[in-house]
Amino acid sequence: MKRTGPTDPNLRRLIRYLRKKSNEEKVKIWKDIAWRLERPRRQRAEVNVSRINRYAKDGDMIVVPGSVLGAGKIEKKVIVAAWKFSETARRKIEEAGGEAITIEELIKRNPKGSGVIIME
């Protein structure tokens, strides 16, 4: 059976954008994130804020190629970019002084991808 990839038009647009930026900026991290987002939905990353709190340091830029969920607590001030956020995850990140942004916003802020950590 032929693999079709994601059917969500917004996700397809994001994957094309990631590949384009990877080629323009000569940065492999965006191509890697595009590849991870192309996976089937049941294999895509789902990261709880407790995991972000456990492994991140204050000021880190984290990319989650999937969903960020609200289980646990977060006390660190981090910038988290992801495909989707649950309402509680977004609220907890912002209450801790961090930012919950889209992957496109992160690329606009940091086109070279320096200092970005991929978390799955």
Curated annotation (Swiss-Prot):
Claim: NAD is one of the keywords in the record: no
Molecular functions per Gene Ontology: RNA binding; structural constituent of ribosome
Record key words, sorted: Ribonucleoprotein, Ribosomal protein
InterPro entries the UniProt entry points to: Ribosomal_eL18, Ribosomal_eL18/eL18-A/B/_CS, Ribosomal_eL18_arc, Ribosomal_uL15/eL18, Ribosomal_uL15/eL18_sf
Any one GO cellular component localisation term in the record: cytosolic large ribosomal subunit
Biological processes annotated in GO: translation
Top-level taxon in the UniProt lineage: Archaea
Protein family per UniProt: Belongs to the eukaryotic ribosomal protein eL18 family.
Name of the featured protein: Large ribosomal subunit protein eL18
Gene: rpl18e
